[in-house]
Amino acid sequence: MAKKVQAYVKLQVAAGMANPSPPVGPALGQQGVNIMEFCKAFNARTESIEKGLPIPVVITVYADRSFTFVTKTPPAAVLLKKAAGIKSGSGKPNKDKVGKVTQDQIRQIAETKAADMTGATIETKMKSIAGTARSMGLVVEE
C-alpha cells in the first residue's frame, strides 16, 4: 500500500549548502522531518552542481515522517545573470539595459533547463529563455 502524503514543501536551497538554518530548518521542522537527514541527502545529490546555485526542491513528506525529494534545475533568471556576468536585472527593463547574452548562451541555458520546461523543441524553449532575458533588461544578440 502506498504511503499517505502529509505535505509537499517547496524550497530553493543553495547547491551543496543545505543546513538546518532558515529556510530549511523551520519548513521541515514543522512537518516533523529529520532535518539533518534531508541536508545530507540534498548535499550529496547536488555535489556535482556548482556550489551556491539556488536549486528548487520539492519535498514530499509522508504521514510516517519519512520523505522523498525531487531537485529541479536552477531558475532561468539565475543562469542568465551568470551568463551575462551581472548581479541583478534591470529595474526598468525597457529603458535600462544591463547586459548582453548571445544565442549560444541562450541555447546552453535552454538545454540545461530542458527537463523542467514545457515546449516541444529546443527552439521554443530558447524563445522562452530569451523572453526572460528581455524582461530582465538583457539584450539578446542574434
UniProtKB/Swiss-Prot annotation:
Subunit structure: Part of the ribosomal stalk of the 50S ribosomal subunit. Interacts with L10 and the large rRNA to form the base of the stalk. L10 forms an elongated spine to which L12 dimers bind in a sequential fashion forming a multimeric L10(L12)X complex.
SMART domains: RL11 (SM00649)
GO biological process entries: translation
HAMAP family, per the entry: Ribosomal_uL11
SUPFAM superfamilies found in the cross-reference section: Ribosomal L11/L12e N-terminal domain, Ribosomal protein L11, C-terminal domain
A GO CC annotation given for this chain: cytosolic large ribosomal subunit
Pfam families noted in UniProt: Ribosomal_L11 (PF00298), Ribosomal_L11_N (PF03946)
GO molecular function: large ribosomal subunit rRNA binding; structural constituent of ribosome
PROSITE patterns attached to this UniProt entry: RIBOSOMAL_L11
Record's keyword terms, sorted: Methylation, Ribonucleoprotein, Ribosomal protein, RNA-binding, rRNA-binding
Organism: Actinobacillus succinogenes (strain ATCC 55618 / DSM 22257 / CCUG 43843 / 130Z)
Processing after translation: One or more lysine residues are methylated.
Name recorded for this polypeptide: Large ribosomal subunit protein uL11
Family: Belongs to the universal ribosomal protein uL11 family.
Matches recorded under Gene3D superfamilies: Ribosomal protein L11, C-terminal domain, Ribosomal protein L11/L12, N-terminal domain
InterPro entries, alphabetized: Ribosomal_uL11 (IPR000911), Ribosomal_uL11_bac-typ (IPR006519), Ribosomal_uL11_C (IPR020783), Ribosomal_uL11_C_sf (IPR036769), Ribosomal_uL11_N (IPR020784), Ribosomal_uL11_N_sf (IPR036796)
Biological role: Forms part of the ribosomal stalk which helps the ribosome interact with GTP-bound translation factors.
